[in-house]
Amino acid sequence: MSMRDPQILDIEQVIKSKAGKNAKRIPKFVINWFKNFMHLDYINGFLKEGYVGVEFCENAIRYLGVELEVEGLENLPKDGRKYTFVSNHPLGAIDGVTLGAIIGREYDGKIRYLMNDLLMNLKGMAPLGIPINKLGGQARSLSKLINEVYSSDNQMIVFPAGLCSRNIDGKIQDLEWGKSFIKFSRLTGRDIVPIHFDGENSKRFYRVATWCKRLKLKFNFAMMLLPDEMYRSTGKKYKITIGKPIPVSEFDKSKSDHEWAQTVRSKVYDL
């Protein structure tokens, strides 16, 4: 076993980087509260082991004691081509880590995610990520970066909703899916593999997300709850269902890319 570089998550630095010029106004007790709320000691206990990439994902599952039931492993293509793996996003953290472990193991670690900037602060995950700043703008540079990664020899893991699932009409489900995975998969000739992840966050998470929407808050407070939600997943069992690849040739001009994205979303929930 090679020597690993121990890591820690400096939540104080993360909070201050998000606060910008207002960082000095944040009371110390608020930062300390966040450290406790986010179970920083527990998280850093794992990060200090220094795992990186797919090894990080696999060992995070072990550390949390999460049990996985995977159906449809035979649907993971073995023809040497590059694919786009798309999934619903019910949990916002452990679902991404889990798919990284499953798909990364199958394809020798050659995977990439679209990843929010909070997760990019985890050094073990960062090498797998394409940074998407949910708290700021980067549209032009992001489009170019995404195209480059789709054109690479990495398998793409995408959560097209962008955010984790919400309580919509009393049902936990993704928001409307974005269309970019259709566009870039077509441009780079990638068939699409649908995946369904069965899971839910706490009721508290959905209440906070609902109030953020009602109050039209720019800052995504619900995202700051995700480390605690991941901690709550300790010892739980999740079912993942992998569907058969959808040929990219199906996504013709009979529908818009937006409509095709919702069609794939429906296929995922039918798994």
Please tell me what each predicted stretch does.
Residues 66-75, 114-117, 140-148:
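Short, charged beta->alpha transition segments
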Residues 46, 60-66, 132-138, 170-171:
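Short, flexible loop segments at the rims of nucleotide/cofactor-binding pockets, characterized by
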Residues 39, 80-137:
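Catalytic core of membrane glycerolipid acyltransferases/transacylases, capturing the structured
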Residues 71-73, 114-116, 132, 243-245, ...:
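Conserved beta-strand termini and adjacent loop/short-helix elements that scaffold enzyme active sites
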Residues 21-36, 41-48, 122-123, 203-235:
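Alpha-helical membrane-targeting segments
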Residues 1-83, 96-98, 126:
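Membrane-anchoring hydrophobic helices of lipid-metabolizing enzymes
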Residues 4-7, 142-271:
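Non-catalytic C-terminal accessory region of glycerolipid acyltransferases
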Residues 75-77, 118-120, 136, 199, ...:
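Residue-level detector of flexible, active-site-proximal loop/helix-junction positions
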